[in-house]
């Protein structure tokens, strides 16, 4: 949870590896001279005691395949199948710019013009995704891919956070039947 002191581990959900109270301690342990912004998510290397990566786009790909050789890793699915990579990459770029980052561009716009531009792009893209899901259960292909999970992170917060706080309020996800059902389907997956 993030408070005035930064990202902190809750007492009832402590850091089980290092006992850190704040995520900034992980950044300092990785690089004592670190002076940048502490961000999440973070992948921590327990052997070398350092942050390996903190970029969500990289992490989803790393977690998809980098550990496949380890015993006990379920390799029965691939979130980034070779035959769909070009389409996934194109959709990820659009979703990131217009939706994932679009809610922030809208919410933190400093001019009316910037607000309207990002607002219009956000809801145009949501409309296109709603139409896309009218003929397909998933965004790309016939199984869940990284494109679905990258959109999920914004959709799951959209109605409770972005509609009111960021003024992304043309329509709620709950009012878009395909996106709403899609979000519900992803949310009900084991481990979510």
Explain the meaning of each model-derived region.
Residues 1-192:
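C-terminal alpha-helical interaction module
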């Amino acid at each position: 949870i993030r408070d005035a002191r930064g990202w902190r581990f809750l007492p009832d959900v402590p850091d089980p590896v290092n006992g850190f109270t704040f995520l900034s301690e992980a950044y300092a342990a990785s690089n004592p001279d670190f002076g940048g912004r502490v961000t999440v998510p973070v992948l921590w290397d327990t052997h070398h005691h350092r942050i390996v990566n903190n970029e969500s786009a990289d992490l989803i790909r790393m977690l998809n395949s980098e550990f496949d050789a380890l015993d006990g890793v379920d390799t029965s699915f691939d979130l980034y199948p070779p035959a769909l990579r070009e389409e996934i990459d194109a959709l990820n770029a659009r979703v990131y710019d217009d939706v994932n980052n679009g809610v922030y561009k809208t919410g933190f716009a400093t001019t009316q013009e910037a607000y309207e531009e990002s607002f219009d792009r956000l809801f145009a893209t949501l409309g296109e995704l709603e139409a896309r899901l009218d003929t397909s259960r998933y965004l790309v292909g016939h199984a869940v891919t990284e494109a679905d999970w990258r959109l999920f992170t914004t959709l799951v917060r959209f109605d409770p956070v972005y509609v009111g706080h960021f003024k992304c309020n043309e329509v709620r996800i709950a009012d878009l039947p395909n996106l709403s059902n899609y979000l519900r389907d992803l949310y009900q997956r084991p481990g979510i």
